[in-house]
Amino acid sequence: GTGAREIGYMFGQYKRIRGMFEGVLTGKGLSYGGSLARTEATGYGLLYLTEELMKCHGESLEGKTIAVSGAGNVAIYACEKAQQLGAKVITVSDSNGYVVDEEGIDLAAVKEIKEVKRGRIKDYLNYRPNAKYVEGAGLWQAVKVDVALPCATQNELLIDDAKALVANGTMIVAEGANMPTTLEATQYLQ
């Protein structure tokens, strides 16, 4: 839940206390020396990488199914770019559970839930009643997708998840979060 507003406050306090205008925090607004498109950069970049990986295998993202974990900036903008590139994202999650929408995630609903209402991802069912919400469990063993994008948290994709993804035919696992795949799972996927 930390955004430009909170970072701006911390940066303002740093500037007030230290009397310096230095770039000590990432995620600042433009008026504080932040970067344009910072919010979208990680999610978009993840998809540009994924697109290039697909090309290496003679494939494209067009028509592929993607599982995304998380519902923060990285996940939201990864979903957005994936949809722009012709893929169908079927999952998003938060710390309480995950949603599977086989028709494709309604990104406008996710943005309203997470960015406007600051709600939980289970509220997605109010927008798309045909979707499925699963509380508590990890999503990686529950879905069959072409691409898996862990964008939620560290160590979220475990060895059993990696084995399930491979068994289900997932072609690519690309990391959006910081170290979301455990070492054991990473070694298995290689």
For the regions a language model picked out, list residue spans one by one:
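Short, surface-exposed connector motifs at secondary-structure boundaries
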Residues: 59-63, 143-146, 164-172
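Rossmann-fold NAD(P)-binding glycine/threonine-rich loop
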Residues: 152-190
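Short, glycine-/Ser/Thr-/acidic-enriched flexible segments
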Residues: 2, 53-54, 73-74, 97, ...
